[in-house]
């Protein structure tokens, strides 16, 4: 049985969040939480929140034991990009792309 949590439209670049997601994929839930607590990346706080939600979904919706859960899948998809103008010299302008992410974490029971 698997439980899933998704955070959508998070205002951080998918590339930055993938660096954090790669650290926890396949790990046990408690180990993943410990890794996220000490990871000095901005995305680690958001990923920790999604992981906590996935564990809560597993406990509440499927009556699974949190100590027996593992991060079976974790991935980041690109959300819509906000395009903003940044003024430059001589009347020119550059486009600033403010990227968003959709973060998905799926937890399942350990296979013996």
Curated annotation (Swiss-Prot):
InterPro entries from the UniProt entry: Ribosomal_uL22, Ribosomal_uL22_bac/chlpt-type, Ribosomal_uL22_bac/org-type, Ribosomal_uL22_CS, Ribosomal_uL22_sf
Description of how the protein assembles with itself and partners: Part of the 50S ribosomal subunit.
Family classification: Belongs to the universal ribosomal protein uL22 family.
Keyword presence, Flavoprotein: no
Recorded GO MF terms: rRNA binding; structural constituent of ribosome
Coiled coil segments of this chain: none
A single GO cellular-component term on record: cytosolic large ribosomal subunit
GO biological process, any: translation
PROSITE patterns named in the record: RIBOSOMAL_L22 (PS00464)
Pfam families (alphabetical): Ribosomal_L22
Keywords attached to this entry: Ribonucleoprotein, Ribosomal protein, RNA-binding, rRNA-binding
Tree of life domain: Bacteria
Underlying gene: rplV
Described function: This protein binds specifically to 23S rRNA; its binding is stimulated by other ribosomal proteins, e.g. L4, L17, and L20. It is important during the early stages of 50S assembly. It makes multiple contacts with different domains of the 23S rRNA in the assembled 50S subunit and ribosome. The globular domain of the protein is located near the polypeptide exit tunnel on the outside of the subunit, while an extended beta-hairpin is found that lines the wall of the exit tunnel in the center of the 70S ribosome.
Official protein name in the record: Large ribosomal subunit protein uL22
């Amino acid at each position: 049985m698997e439980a899933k949590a998704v955070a959508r439209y998070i205002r951080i670049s998918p590339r930055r969040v993938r660096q954090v997601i790669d650290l926890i994929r396949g790990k046990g839930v408690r180990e993943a939480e410990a890794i996220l607590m000490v990871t000095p990346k901005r995305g680690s706080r958001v990923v920790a929140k999604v992981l906590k939600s996935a564990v809560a979904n597993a406990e509440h919706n499927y009556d699974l034991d949190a100590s027996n859960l593992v991060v079976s899948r974790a991935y980041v998809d690109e959300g819509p990009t906000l395009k903003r103008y940044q003024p430059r010299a001589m009347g020119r302008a550059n486009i600033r792309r403010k990227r968003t992410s959709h973060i998905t974490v799926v937890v399942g029971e350990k296979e013996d």
